[in-house]
Amino acid sequence: MEFSDTTYSWSGKTVLIVEDNETSNIYFEAALRKTKANLVWAKNGLDAVEMVKKNNQINLILMDINMPKLDGIEATRIIKGLFPEIIIVVQTAFILSGEERLCVDAGCDEFITKPIRLKYLLDTINRYLASPKET
């Protein structure tokens, strides 16, 4: 799917992508690069928590659930406890019974299942990052 450079414009916004799968990272980078958002990465929940503590410019986190060291649910709980204003969009390929409820209880703002449709991903993020006049 193609979109113009102005369809989704998040210049000045920082998106942290927390994902341990290299293929998913390539997809997210390709999907988000035209948005002009500053993209940063963490390979697991523990790294994400540390990065958020050090970088107060993060506006939105795209968080995987199943990762080593610290899973996305616990990372979400910790980050939301420290910085409730950061938007967290959880994305996962595994739908276990009650998993979405656990994510919501941990504080996630959105829950997306893989495979992720590009337009749905961009529209979801845009709800949080677009300037008021753009929504």
What are these regions (language model features)?
Residues 19:
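Conserved acidic carboxylate
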Residues 26-34:
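Charged docking surfaces used in two-component/phosphorelay signaling
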Residues 36-43, 51, 112:
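Short hydrophobic/Thr-rich beta-strand motif most characteristic of the beta2 strand and flanking loop
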Residues 56-62:
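Active-site beta3 strand of CheY-like receiver
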Residues 67:
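Receiver (REC) domain active-site loop signature in two-component systems and cognate sites
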Residues 116-125:
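C-terminal output helix
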